Amino acid sequence: MRKILLSFITISFIVGCNQNNSKQNQTKVADEVTYGKPQLNEKSASYLYHFAFDCIDQEYPNKLGQVLGNATYLKEPSELHPAFYGCFDWHSSVHGHWTLLNIVKDLPNFEYREAVFQKLQKSITKENILKEVQYFDDVHNKSFERTYGWAWLLKVAETLQDWNTEEATKMYENLEPLVELVENKYMEFLPKLKYPIRVGEHPNTAFGMSFALDYAKKYSPELENIIIEKAKEYYMNDKGCPINWEPGGFDFLSPCLQEASLMLKVLPNEEYVSWLDTFLPNFRNNPSQYLNVTEVTDRSDGKLAHLDGLNFSRAWCLYEIGNILQNDKMVNLANKHFEYSYKKMDSGEYAGAHWLASFALYAVLKSN
């Protein structure tokens, strides 16, 4: 009886070991799958462009995010925001413009180039932008689109100033009063923000600072200094970011990766690697252990559709970090995230169609 029991225990141990080895091998095989890197070409541009092109002058449905001072504030979206009234909300309209600008900037022979310019030149006019400035100056709406929409507006400004063409120069001249206003709003707000906002949606401080820093490094030294100073104040001593808690059900940004992306732009490479290993221990060695693609259960639900955006924003952060650190595992994980949601964007649901092309394009541009 004793021999039988020992034999049973031995067999059970061997079977258990074999099962564990099988699981480990399966994980290893999954990790070794190589995903293709996205490219901006005529095909991908034509796919992405129509999302933004179709919505930047689509006025309804519309989410205004407005504070009413009295009954006279009740106006049509196109009256309140003559430049950026489409694509459901102000910030999506702004980054819809960014999407179209970057497609025609990077692909000079793009098939729909002239149609894009005609549409953009109707919205980014001097008169329209001055009305946008007036809205931001209203006593009841001074924090409008803080800081998410501000960040995307500076992305538009960055593109126009980087792009040395007659059309871009003219559009930037028209946009400049709003750009200056947003710069000043950043410089007024960040010194007063005692604690960073660490959520996976619009108010995320690291996202707002990261995009603004890209612009400021080229065109606004004063804003650059403020952002770098505040980034170190907020994030330099952070340790062990709980990335295993992510994602939240409505997230379109990764709080941990947005912070890691920002600090990549703030710290020298050697110092950054040390910071990253403290902030996200072992992440460089095995990023797929901590992140997998997020799945969307209902693309008609605007909040649940955020998770497609999360796949794209994770991808661009992983590209930024992985390319600088020459980390192929991060880049491959970025490719995996991108591929999953890119194939599902054209669902026919406006909940995602009004904004996801910008996130997808930004990831594509960061992949190279």
Protein language model annotation of sequence segments:
Residues L48-P61, A115-Q134, N174-Y195, L223-I243, ...:
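Long, well-ordered core segments of solenoidal/helical folds
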Residues G86, V94, L101-S220:
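Extended ligand-binding groove/face enriched in aromatic
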Residues G36-E42, P77-V94, Y135-A151, K192-T205, ...:
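Solvent-exposed loop and edge beta-strand segments that line ligand/cofactor-binding
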Residues K28-Y85, E349:
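Low-complexity, Ser/Thr/Pro/Gly-enriched N-terminal "stalk/linker" regions
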Residues N292-N368:
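Fungal-biased detection of long, low-complexity, Ser/Thr-
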Residues N18-N25:
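Bacterial lipoprotein signal-peptidase II cleavage site
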Residues I14-G16:
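C-terminal motif of bacterial Sec signal peptides marking the signal peptidase cleavage site
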Residues A30-L40, V94-F110, A151-E167, G208-Y219, ...:
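Well-ordered alpha-helical scaffold segments within catalytic/enzyme domains
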